[in-house]
Amino acid sequence: MEXLQGYLEKGRSRQQPLLYPLLFQEYIYALAHDRGLKGSLFYEPTEVFGYDSXSRLALVKRLIIXIYQQNFFLFGVNDSNKNRFVSHHHNNFCYSHFYSQVISQGFAILVEIPFSLRLXSYFEKKEIPXSHNLRSIHSIFPFLEDKLLHLNYVSDILIPHPIHMEILVQILQCWIQDVPLLHFLRFFLHKYHNWNSFLITPKKSIYVFSKENKRLFRFLYNSYVSECEFLLVFLRKQSSYLRLTSFGFFLERRHFYVKIERLRMQHLILIVVCRDFFQGTLWSFKDPFMXXXXXXXXXVLASXGTHLLXKKWXYNXXNLWQYYFHFWYQSYRIHMNQLSXYSFYFLGYLSSLLKNSSTVRNQMLENSFLIDTVTNKFETLVPVIFLIGSLSKAQFCTVSGHPISKPIWADLSDSEIIERFGRMCRNLSHYHSGSSKKQGLYRIKYILRLSCARTSAXTHXSTVRTFXRRLGSGLLEEFFTEEEQVLSLILPKTIPFTFYGSHKERIWYLDIIRINDLVNHS
C-alpha cells in the first residue's frame, strides 16, 4: 500500500495557485455564460432559467457582494411553495436554483483552469501532436480488435456508484491545494443536499445535482473515474519490467479530449494502453498481457493466461478500490468469463471473439497430411434486443418489437415527422456502421420506418397503406439515400454493394464523440 501511495503522489502534479479569490470576479461568471470561452477546450454554453443578461449580471453582483460579507451565510428553508436561498444579513432572497447554478458554473470554471494549463504544458513538454481522431468513440474498437485477439479471459467490473460527494471533494483535494475553495465547495455540496432532502430521496440527490449542475458534476465525476483508472494503471505497471511511458500521455488525452466535448456525464471512456501508440514500441511483462477499457460505470478487463491469473487482476483491483475509497466492494459486481464463449456489451455493441477453423492439405513428396488451424475474429453486433427495449420505452414499438405510432408527435407536420424518424435512422446507421452483420440494424430501421408511417397516418386519420400510397417513394428516400451515398463513396468500386443485402463491411467513423441516444436508454 505504501507503493500505491507513492505512485499516486508521483502521478499527481499538485497545483499551488490560489483560485478562491477568482470566485469574486464577475468575468468568471461571464465566461461560464458563453462570453469569450468559445475557443476553450471546455466550452459548453449554459443558460439559467431564462433570465436575460442584465438580470443575470445583477444577481451575480448581488451574490458576490453577499459572499464578501463576513457574517454572511446561506441555508435552505423548507418553504411550502419554493425552495429558496435566504440571506439573513440582507433580508433578501433569490431562487436557490439560480444561485446554485451560478456558483456551480463558477466552480467549474475555476477547477478547470489548472487542468487546462497542465494539459497544454504537457503537450508542449512531450512535443505530442494533437490527434483529434482519438475523440471518436469508434477509435476504441480497432484497439480492442487488435488486442483481444490474443487474450483469453474478460472480466466485467461495475465501477462503484453512486459515490458520496465528500469523496469527490477529497479526490479533488489531492490535485488542488486551495483550502478555501475546497471548503466552499464542500459547503455548497452539503447545503445543496439539504435543500433537496425534503423533495427527493438520498439516492436521487446526486442524480438531481448532476442534472442541474452538469458542468461541475461532470468534472467531479471525471475526477473520481480518473482515480479508479490510476489504480488500474498502478496494477499494470507493477507487472511490467519496464516503465510504460504511454500511460501518462493517453490518460491526459482521455481527460481532456475524449470526455469533455458534448459527452454526457455517465458515458466516460478509458483505454489503458499497454504500448506506445505513436512509437510502436512493444513491451514485455512478467504477467500475461492485460488490457482494460471502461465506459459509464462499467469496466472491462481482458487478460491472457489462466483463469486464476485473471481472477487475480479483478481481486487486486477490488481490494485497491476498497482501500483507497473506503467502501465495501461487492464481489458479485465482478464476472469472469472466457472470451471465446462470451459476448460483452460495450458502447452499444455486443462484442465477442469467434473461432474460425480451417483445414489445409499439405503435400510433401509422396505424403500428404491435413493441418487444422484456428483463427480468432473480433465480431461486433448490433444489440437488437436492447435497442428494441429502448424503442419500446420511447413509444416507437411494443416490447415485442411491433411498430406503433408515436402519439406525442401527432401534432407535427408530415415533413417534420419524416425528418425526425429519418434522422434517427441515419444516426443509428452512422453509429452502428461497425457492425459485422447488418440484419439486426435493418430490423431496427424497419420498426422506425413503419412507426413513422403509422404516426403520420394517425395525424390524417387514415391507414398506413393510404398514407404510403400518397407519399410514394419519398419515405424510403428520406431514410436510406444519404447512407447509401456515403457508403458508396467509402467502399471501393470493385466491391459490389447492395444496400438491402447482408454486406459485412465494417466502417469506423472518426467523428463520433457521443453515444447514440437509443444506446443510452438501453
Swiss-Prot record:
Organism expressing this protein natively: Iris sanguinea (Japanese iris)
Family label: Belongs to the intron maturase 2 family. MatK subfamily.
GO annotation, cellular component aspect: chloroplast
GO biological process: mRNA processing; RNA splicing; tRNA processing
GO molecular function: RNA binding
Entry keyword set: Chloroplast, mRNA processing, Plastid, RNA-binding, tRNA processing
Domain of life: Eukaryota
Reported function: Usually encoded in the trnK tRNA gene intron. Probably assists in splicing its own and other chloroplast group II introns.
Chain coiled-coil ranges: none
Entries under HAMAP family matching the protein: MatK (MF_01390)
Pfam (any one): Intron_maturas2
Record's protein name: Maturase K
Gene: matK
Main location: plastid
Location within or outside the cell: Plastid, Chloroplast
